[in-house]
């Protein structure tokens, strides 16, 4: 998020819930998991919501990594830094959307009618066949700065 957004944030709220597996989560996480973890990150500046991220992780991954979902500081560190340091590879699909579905309907994303949507799958070295996490990043167009670095593999 921080590399694609021109603002700095003074607050990041993290919420999670446990959801039953759906066909969508089975597809994006590439495994059967009776329960998946859905995590929301709300990036704020001056109280206004400037960006939003939604993450799915399988319960198997959470348990294997011994992640404490109730420790918000450590979870944020994992989601924002450690997962990328431990990643084997990943892919990103860039889309444009006019719809942002926030869990809390009272929240409104700045510029929500025009957002870049980055769909990111991160794979881990320990289990390279299964995604570590699947992210959806919503970045309002007016705050976006998306650059791609291409290297020869």
Question: Residue ranges of each PLM-predicted region?
Answer:
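C-terminal all-alpha effector/ligand-binding and dimerization domain
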Residues: 7-153
């Amino acid at each position: 998020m921080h590399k694609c957004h021109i603002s700095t944030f003074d607050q990041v709220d993290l919420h999670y819930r446990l959801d039953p597996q759906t066909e969508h989560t089975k597809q994006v996480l590439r495994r059967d998991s009776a329960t998946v973890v859905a995590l929301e990150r709300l990036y704020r500046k001056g109280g206004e919501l400037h960006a939003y991220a939604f993450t799915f992780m399988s319960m198997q991954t959470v348990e294997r990594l011994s992640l404490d979902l109730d420790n918000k500081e450590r979870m944020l560190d994992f989601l924002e830094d450690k997962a990328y340091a431990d990643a084997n590879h990943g892919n990103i699909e860039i889309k444009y959307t006019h719809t942002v579905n926030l869990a809390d309907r009272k929240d409104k994303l700045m510029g929500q009618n025009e957002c870049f949507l980055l769909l990111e799958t991160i794979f881990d070295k320990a289990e390279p066949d299964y995604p570590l996490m699947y992210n959806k990043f919503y970045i309002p167009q007016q705050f976006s700065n998306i650059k791609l670095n291409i290297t020869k593999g």
